[in-house]
């Protein structure tokens, strides 16, 4: 089943649930007044509780969105949160000339399900809970899963051996992906989701320091955030207080 976040296949065969489910909302606009080629990120409990909002240049348009967990949103929708961002006096000028040309909304399942493969049944992509806990992206992990398991799956098909034990063996190839998700979520929680607005201000003030910015530029990679996160927890004194939030998941996966 590659049938999305609310996978019928996953539910029918009782293969488990993604560890967390976020909601994302994005509009595509013209007229956003940001720096050319630069991504803008916004944080705070009023606009994206526990997570962040974004404005990403995309050719002639800009993609503006926000995401969060339903239990952190206080009964509000992501659309309401995004409206609040665009109306905030701090940023309103950037959005004043925006004209909407498209909108998108949907669930973001993250945290691999307990049993992504059983006898003669396999889950892929969002159905398996493969979205990144740090960015919500799901295309990259989905393709990575396909590249990882396809050779053994094809071999199992040719041998007509899709038994539960055979599928468990193939699932074992995905355990590093599961551990990476746990570690990335632990870092996200430490730096973002479990931080108050005051703590976020302090974190961003540290990130803005030249030596920290240089560190981020040297080893930071959006597809692989774990090495940077661990190094910041280890080497930057101001971040050591965050270590206890993340250390168990980071070390043990």
Language-model features: locations:
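FAD/FMN-dependent oxidoreductases across multiple families
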Residues: 72-153, 157-158, 168-169
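A general structural signal for short secondary-structure boundary/capping elements
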Residues: 42-49, 70-74, 89-93, 100-111, ...
């Amino acid at each position: 089943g590659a049938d999305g976040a609310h996978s019928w296949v996953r539910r029918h065969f009782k293969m488990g649930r993604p560890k967390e489910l976020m909601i994302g909302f994005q509009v595509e606009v013209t007229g956003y007044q940001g720096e050319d080629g630069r991504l803008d990120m916004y944080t705070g409990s009023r606009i994206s509780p526990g997570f962040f909002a974004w404005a990403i240049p995309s050719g002639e348009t800009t993609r503006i969105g926000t995401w969060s967990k339903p239990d952190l949103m206080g009964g509000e929708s992501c659309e309401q949160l995004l409206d609040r961002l665009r109306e905030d006096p701090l940023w309103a000028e950037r959005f004043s000339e925006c004209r909407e040309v498209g909108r998108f909304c949907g669930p973001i399942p993250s945290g691999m399900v307990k049993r992504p493969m059983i006898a003669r049944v396999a889950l892929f992509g969002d159905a398996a809970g493969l979205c990144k806990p740090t960015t919500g992206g799901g295309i990259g992990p989905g393709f990575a899963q396909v590249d990882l398991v396809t050779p053994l799956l094809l071999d199992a098909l040719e041998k007509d051996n899709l038994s539960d034990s055979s599928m468990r063996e193939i699932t074992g190839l995905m355990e590093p992906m599961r551990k990476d998700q746990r570690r990335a979520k632990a870092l996200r929680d430490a730096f973002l989701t479990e931080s108050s607005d005051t703590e976020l201000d302090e974190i961003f003030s540290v990130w803005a320091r030249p030596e920290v910015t240089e560190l981020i530029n040297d080893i930071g990679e959006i597809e692989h955030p774990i090495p940077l996160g661990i190094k910041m927890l280890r080497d930057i004194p101001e971040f050591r207080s965050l270590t206890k939030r993340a250390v168990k998941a980071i070390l043990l996966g």
